[in-house]
């Protein structure tokens, strides 16, 4: 498992990695959390069924990360998605972007399309989709710049502009009533990316509240949990804040469905 993430056991020990946090990258929880942050800060939206993790090299990003209707694998334009560095059979993809960040963009005019060609950008066959990327996201080094930017210039690296996406607790295995959920990176649940309209409409249980709570109902592996499935302490500050956020920012259609 460590190898699949690009680290070996010695490197993990040297870095003092938290096993649960580390596992949250491998089980899909952390990609869902980060995609939610991007979605809520930009207005890009998730696919109805969340992340698909299509296998993709850097060169193939403009081909794969475009709508299905145009030959790609995305549900719609303006979607958040994560590229897998492994093929479905476990084979490593050469020149992958496991540790990096990227954005695929579309030319909106013929002039822009011509610029892609003239500047020799990597594009899809139509010449309209291209990509910008960094193969390495230097997390520990970059966070200091964000802190300084906020403190000195009052300028955030990113902040929410709306409630577009959510991360919902989903069963890793069949769960029985009475079991205690152990949260992000644990043995019981992982986080799945949901459109916020879907999550709030269903009364879904956020991954962030799925720690040290008792299960009230049997849950099948792969089933996403709801508030009704667990014994939730409504007096907790985190629960109160989440409920307030849902009241204030949930899409109108979801509020009606939840009533």
Model-derived regions: residue spans:
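C-terminal catalytic/substrate-binding lobe primarily of soluble NAD(P)-dependent oxidoreductases
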Residues: 10-257
């Amino acid at each position: 498992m460590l190898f699949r993430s690009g680290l070996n056991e010695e490197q993990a020990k040297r870095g003092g990695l938290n096993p649960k946090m580390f596992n949250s990258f491998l089980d899909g929880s952390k990609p869902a959390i980060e995609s939610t942050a991007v979605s809520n800060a930009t207005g890009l939206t998730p696919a109805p069924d969340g992340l698909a993790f299509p296998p993709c090299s850097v060169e193939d990003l403009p081909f794969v990360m475009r709508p299905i209707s145009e030959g790609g694998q995305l549900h719609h334009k303006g979607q958040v998605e994560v590229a897998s560095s492994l093929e479905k059979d476990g084979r490593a993809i050469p020149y992958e972007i496991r540790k990096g960040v990227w954005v695929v963009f579309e030319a909106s005019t013929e002039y822009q399309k011509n610029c892609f060609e003239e500047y020799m950008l990597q594009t899809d066959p139509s010449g309209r989709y291209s990509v910008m990327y960094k193969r390495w996201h230097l997390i520990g080094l970059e966070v200091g710049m964000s802190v300084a930017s906020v403190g000195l210039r009052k300028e955030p690296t990113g902040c929410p502009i709306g409630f577009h996406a959510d991360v919902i607790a989903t069963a890793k295995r069949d769960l029985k009533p009475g079991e205690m959920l152990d949260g992000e990176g644990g043995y019981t649940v992982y986080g799945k990316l949901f459109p916020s309209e879907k999550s709030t409409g269903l009364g879904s249980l956020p991954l962030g509240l799925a720690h040290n709570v008792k299960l009230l109902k049997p849950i099948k592996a792969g089933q996403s949990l709801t508030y009704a499935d667990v014994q939730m302490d409504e007096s907790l500050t985190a629960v109160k804040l989440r409920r307030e956020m849902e009241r204030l920012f949930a899409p109108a259609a979801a509020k009606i469905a939840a009533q």
